Amino acid sequence: MEIRLHTISYAGLGRKVTTLKRLLILSDSHRFLEPMVRAVEHVKPDYIFHLGALSADAQQLAQRVMQIPVLSVTGNCDFLDRSQEQRMVELEGVKILLCHGHRYHVKSTLLPLYLAARENGVRLALFGHTHTALLEEKDGITLLNPGSCGPSMRASCAVVELSGG
């Protein structure tokens, strides 16, 4: 699996990021647990974010790596679990949106996702669904899709390192 590293520096947060936080971003695993476990072992993240499809994979991963917090949302293939389709978290003063992306129609446009992020003061919007890795920045908002860590010849995930600017 390809691992893409993105160090994102946020200046002007009102306080300095004292400790570099390493986030492993996974999406669209579709029951492929072992590549995720290997990515965790390689990356050694502080947090794991799973962006849906399938949410049960995130639960199984959390059981395997109990020392690392796993935050997840549901996606378009999580028919039996619609518990949390999106969530917002704040780490070191950076507000982060986690979603699968299908409700924002990310296969055709990123505008609804960008507008939701802007409206909610989000600096980092994480989404999946397209199975294609993407990194875009607009007006201080970073949009990131890690790609699919599931059944693909081009399986990928992303690592985000939060640092102060």
Language-model features: where?
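Glycine/small-residue-rich loop that forms an oxyanion/phosphate-binding "nest" at active or ligand-binding sites
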Residues: 71, 77, 83-99, 105-120
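Short acidic, glycine/proline-enriched helix-loop-strand junctions
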Residues: 63-71, 135-149
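Core catalytic region of metal-dependent phosphoesterases/phosphodiesterases
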Residues: 7-10, 15, 21-91
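Residue-level detector of beta-strand structural context in well-folded domains
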Residues: 86-87, 133, 158
